[in-house]
Every structure is written in C-alpha cells, then in structure tokens.
Amino acid sequence: MDNYLASLLTEQVNERTKEIDRCDTAGILNMINDEDRIVPEAVGKEIPHIARAVDMIVDAIRGGGRLFYFGAGTSGRLGVLDASECTPTFGVSHDLIQGHIAGGDTALRNAVEDSEDSEDLGRDEIGRLGITASDVVTGIAASGRTPYVLGVVRQAAAVGAKTIGITTNPDSILQREVDVCIAPL
C-alpha cells in the first residue's frame, strides 16, 4: 500500500471497534449503535458545505440545469439509489437528477472490476451524457481518490459544470478538485 493510501482515514483501524470480532451479538450491535451516534455530529459540522451544495444545485435546476451523481462500487450505488428516488418522491423527470456508476448498470448488482480505476472512463461520461456548464456534477468516493470519479469531476469542471465532492477522507484529492466538498469525518 502506498504512503498516501495508507494515510487515509478510511484505511485506518477504528480503535473503538477493533475487537468487534470477539464480541457476542449484543456487543457487536452496541458497537455499531455507538458508531452510528457519531453521524449526526459529523454531518452537523458539514452543514455550511451542505448548504453551499444545495444552493448550487437549486440555482442550476432553476436555470435549466441537471444534477448528476457519479461513483464506483457502493458510492456509485448510493448515488444511483438517491437519484432513482427523486422521480417518485418529487415528481421530477428522471433526466433531471441522474445517478451513474462505474461499470454501468451491471455494476449495480455485480462487481465490475477495474472500471473504477480508469480516469478516462470518468472523463468520457461527461461527453456521453452531454453535461454542460448549466449542470452540477457530484462525485462520490469514500477514499476521495477513485480515478473514475476524479476523471468525472475534472472533465465536468473543464466544460464549466459546477462540481461537488462527497468523501469520508478530509483533505483528499477529490476535495481539492471540486467547488464544494462534503467530508464529514
């Protein structure tokens, strides 16, 4: 593992749960519950960034733009899931808010190895989808370094689209590449 990767928060041992494999079921569930209690405070600290992102999205949609989510693996699945719920929940066109995952629809149910490792595949998505300066592109990457996501946000910025990053690693490469970054850890 290279030094940068080894330094990422997501690659560290969580000292509070390092003995989870030695616990009984109730102990495991209590550890998970304790970790879940951290989430609201972490999100609370990101409210200024979340507000900037929401305002950016609202302005884009009011101006005729669209919102896109991009990610790989679980990050991509979550973006696709969120986007897919907007049509039935809010009555908006499925074209207005879209989720895309490295490896395409097959990757929603099965791992598509190496698709996340191509910055070129990410860049190509912007042209394929006709993303313009009117749109907002959100890159989701727990590590903050997924090449597919970096390719997406870099190319989106090159065409003038606003960019948002969502990651669990503060001071990540993704954070440095986007207009607004939400990094709640």
Task: Report each predicted region and the residues it spans.
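Glycine-rich phosphate-binding loops that contact phosphosugars or nucleotide phosphates
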Residues: F68, A72-L185
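Short secondary-structure boundary/capping elements
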Residues: I20-D24, H49, D114-L121
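Cofactor-/ligand-binding subdomain signature composed of acidic, glycine-rich
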Residues: M1-A42, E46
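Structured helix-beta-strand junction loops
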Residues: E35, G63-G64, E177
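Short, positively charged patches
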Residues: E11-N14, D24, A51-D55, R66
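Flexible, glycine/charged-enriched surface loops at secondary-structure junctions
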Residues: A42, I50, L174-Q175
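A short, well-structured juxtamembrane/interface segment
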Residues: K45-R62
